[in-house]
Amino acid sequence: MKTFVLAAATFTLLALSAAAQTAPEVRTVASFHAIEVSNGIELRLASGTAQRVEATADDAEQLARLKTEVRDGVLKITFDRKLNETWTMSKTRHLRVSVTATALTALHASSGSTVEVPGAFTTDKLDVSVSSGATLKAKFTSTDLRAQVSSGGVATVAGNAQRLDVGASSGGVFKGGELLARACDANASSGGTVDVAVQETLTAKASSGGDVRYSGSPKDVTRHTSSGGSVKGR
């Protein structure tokens, strides 16, 4: 009986120790207006009246290597890889950072990172890029929204924009069927795909197998296609 109690107590202590190691860690960082995330890290972004950065990982060692640093107003979220370290996506799938931002002018996701913006984020001007297998799912309300998706990146964006400037290349995909833009410039090249909803004015360029699809019955549509590119309404 004593052996059983001792074993149970030991197990409880180990469990508590593990829980303590993986508890979310609130980071104190300088003020920022832009975010860059990479290395397969999961980012959950929200709008709020006070900025907040919270990091979680599977263990204390990974948490210490999960970096959240502000440089020139940009919050850089990265993982500190060791020299000659063999790297696979499985090693980053449990690296998560939750960010509350008071303002946002740019959001860049790369290298297999995942960005989710579950609530509407309102901003005047926003520059978004998604590349190298990264994914973005967001809802934005913006006066001027610029988005570039490349190298297998996928961006799924809803909301509203007075003006949308979007480009997709090298297999990048921009899914903006639920993002209503008053005016839009869309450019798809090298197998990139752009899907947009436009109210008034659309200028669409497609080349080298790029594909632009649009809805919303825009009043004025200008098309430029070459080298197997396609621009079509749906």
Predicted regions and their residues:
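Acidic (Asp/Glu) and glycine-rich low-complexity loops/linkers
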Residues: A19-S110, T114-S129, K139-R146, A158-D165, ...
